[in-house]
A protein has these predicted regions:
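PRPP-associated nucleotide enzymes
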Residues: 1-151
């Protein structure tokens, strides 16, 4: 069985994808819900997913075409942190809001001018969190090269 079919079956069997009436973070109503934050509870499948993303990036984007991964908490960050470790690339993450304590930053990680960044997100409905993250990064004089979403 190829990875996509095997992974979809796993998501269904472990109730990571559920069917019913759901209201998503964007406010959109959906007949299904995917909670990829549960995948690290299944380390073998989690590693397969990370490896599959690594292969996709190698073949379709090329590791030489970006400097760092960027993501948003929480779902995307879970994936991006493991992926960054596997491909040995830095990781930046963007909070929805700046912290009210410590350094009061919304963007964490080292960003240099003109870095090419690859956005990793777990599930996208309206794209709002990705758009807001890109705006925060652009304020730091950087752009996002490409966005990858698992769903």
């Amino acid at each position: 069985m190829d990875f996509v079919k095997e992974f979809a079956t796993f998501l269904y069997e472990k109730k990571i994808i559920r069917f019913g009436d759901f209201t998503l973070a964007s406010g959109t109503k959906s007949p299904y819900y995917i909670d990829l934050r549960l995948i690290p509870s299944f380390p073998h499948e989690y590693r397969k997913m990370i490896k599959e993303l690594q292969n996709f990036i190698a073949e379709d984007i090329g590791f030489e075409n970006f400097h760092s991964l960027v993501s948003v908490p929480t779902g995307g960050l879970i994936v991006a942190a493991s992926l960054a470790t596997e491909i040995v690339k830095p990781l930046i993450y963007v909070r929805k809001q700046a912290k009210e304590h410590g350094t009061a930053k919304s963007v964490e990680g080292v960003i240099c001018r003109d870095m090419k960044l690859l956005m990793i997100e777990d599930v996208i409905t309206s794209g709002g969190s990705v758009i807001n993250a890109i705006k925060s990064i652009k304020e730091k004089k950087n752009g996002c090269h490409r966005c990858i979403c698992n769903s």
